[in-house]
Curated annotation (Swiss-Prot):
Phylogenetic lineage: Bacteria, Pseudomonadati, Pseudomonadota, Gammaproteobacteria, Enterobacterales
Designated name of the protein: Galactokinase
Gene3D superfamilies attached to this UniProt entry: 3.30.230.10, GHMP kinase, C-terminal domain
Organism: Escherichia fergusonii (strain ATCC 35469 / DSM 13698 / CCUG 18766 / IAM 14443 / JCM 21226 / LMG 7866 / NBRC 102419 / NCTC 12128 / CDC 0568-73)
Active site annotation, chain numbering: D174 (proton acceptor)
Gene Ontology CC annotation, any one: cytosol
Keywords: ATP-binding, Carbohydrate metabolism, Cytoplasm, Galactose metabolism, Kinase, Magnesium, Metal-binding, Nucleotide-binding, Transferase
Enzyme kind, highest EC tier: transferase
Amino acid sequence: MSLKEKTQSLFANAFGYPATHTIQAPGRVNLIGEHTDYNDGFVLPCAIDYQTVISCAPRDDRNVRVMAADYENQLDEFSLDAPIVAHENYQWANYVRGVVKHLQLRNNSFGGVDMVISGNVPQGAGLSSSASLEVAVGTVLQQLYHLPLDGAQIALNGQEAENQFVGCNCGIMDQLISALGKKNHALLIDCRSLGTKAVSMPKGVAVVIINSNFKRTLVGSEYNTRREQCETGARFFQQPALRDVTIEEFNAVAHELDPIVAKRVRHILTENARTVEAASALEQGDLKRMGELMAESHASMRDDFEITVPQIDTLVEIVKAVIGDKGGVRMTGGGFGGCIVALIPEELVPAVQQAVAEQYEAKTGIKETFYVCKPSQGAGQC
């Protein structure tokens, strides 16, 4: 049963009438451009064919009812006429409440809604299940009430909800690609202007995501430390963000910076340049160059930004040994575990899967999870 059929069926059973709309918003994987988003830089993600799906209908009052199919059909109810505060027991409900609350601040011309939510974006894997949920909820209200909001505004609303209501720091990339993704394309995003450019993906190339299943423990504290180090670097150059510093300016005075901060800054500057070049390489179908850029990105994350772990490095090495210069592989996401992403000719996928199955667990004691994805369409009706 598809997520659409599942949520529609549950909706009718729970609420006693049929849903009028079914909305989806996808998860994402970032092909290159890591930790550049909060430095006003460039990222190159694609939406993937794992998504949050919501069957929904407008109500003729001011109440919101939300059922979470993936959490034992837990039900949350709240009113649009009372202050929206955090739910004491259901963390999932706070993503929904946060999106609705921040949407009220932007455009309060919507009424009540019934929703049933289900999703298959792996949680805790760094594939943006939370952004997918935020964008899906925003799109539900936009579609049901014909709100004059575009994808970028729905994305910004989701980011605000996550930062201010849920209380998690995040950049804008995850919500933006979920809202604006394009089938068979990656999206080059300028995280300062929020300008986007669709970049066609070469035919016959699979987007493979492998979860190391190494439990990320440091990611929150270390993420905040990296942000502070980048801000320290920007202040040193008297610029609003590292986006505004050139590699030449950096090289001239790198010795004056704290050595750790210098390494962090170098990663951001080189990663920004790599990301812009990667978009060109992909567009030209130059998988060899894309692979080189992904390898440089991984080395920079490992050595300069210091956010990889041995398990992730091992996974990258196993994949690289199989694909050689026929594709690319690197860690993706915040770091300290999580996933790697690989662009692989479709005919090599079985060999990669076999090599990883034979070697990764033997070397690390952890079993990986392997996903073969298609670059997919952003949020909308399904």
